[in-house]
Design a protein with these regions (language model features):
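Positively charged, low-complexity intrinsically disordered leader regions
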Residues: 1-33
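Substrate-binding N-lobe of the ribokinase-like
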Residues: 2-4, 8, 14-15, 37, ...
Length: 111
């Protein structure tokens, strides 16, 4: 029975629609040598920064890497973070025609 199901999936691969928050994940790497005198927070000496697809972008990237036919439906701002997300999706050949760009919102970023 499982073999029949697998054969059906191979004959007609499913298309998956991913709906959700498309966000930019930012990772900051550095070292801490001291604490700020104004507040009890660490002062980070930045060594490198990475940015990648987050939220629904992470899901659609994983589906794409698995070879699954998929499409993304989401909203991002008309800002530099939105540009970066659109470029990263395009680099992975992920369909972006259903990603709406609005100048009235800012693209969500997580650090």
């Amino acid at each position: 029975m499982l073999a029949q199901l697998i054969n059906r999936i191979k004959e007609k691969p499913p298309t998956i629609l991913v709906l959700g928050d498309l966000m930019l994940d930012r990772f900051i790497f550095g070292s801490v040598d001291r604490i700020s005198p104004e507040a009890p927070v660490p002062i980070v000496k930045l060594k490198k920064e990475e940015q990648m697809l987050g939220g629904s972008g992470n899901v659609i990237r994983n589906l794409s890497n698995l070879g699954v036919q998929s499409s993304l439906c989401s909203v991002v701002g008309e800002d530099s973070s939105g540009d970066l997300l659109i470029n990263q999706l395009a680099e992975k050949n992920i369909e972006i025609s259903n990603v709406l760009r609005l100048n009235s919102i800012r693209t969500t970023e997580k650090m």
